Amino acid sequence: MYNEEEKMYKKVVVFGGGTGSSYLLKGLKDFPVDITAVITVSDNGRSTGKLRKEFNTPAVGDIRKVITALSEIDDPIKKMVEYRFNTSSDLNGHAVGNLILTAMLDITGS
């Protein structure tokens, strides 16, 4: 339920995916607006592409970017979620946040 102050906020809906949406949303969160983001889940690049193929899941990379852009979590945690492994192992190129979101999809089944 909205309180009186929240009723005065303009409602902004952002449709998209990719880096552009996360930058736009990061900027919008500093304004008194009610933000809704509709993010595509069809990306197939790097970590997301590997995880989609391996686990047959929606693309989580753009969702991860939007979550960190809109969140109020501390910078060290944001850096950890956005961190990409640079190794010669199978983790190479994976973002920690993508692995976490994929695990949540696997745990919840949705």
Predicted regions and their residues:
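Short, Lys/Arg-enriched N-terminal segments with co-localized hydrophobic residues
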Residues: 1-7
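N-terminal phosphate-binding or glycine-rich loops at protein starts, especially the Walker A/P-loop
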Residues: 7-55, 105
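Glycine-rich nucleotide/cofactor/substrate-binding loop typically near the N-terminus or early
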Residues: 39-109
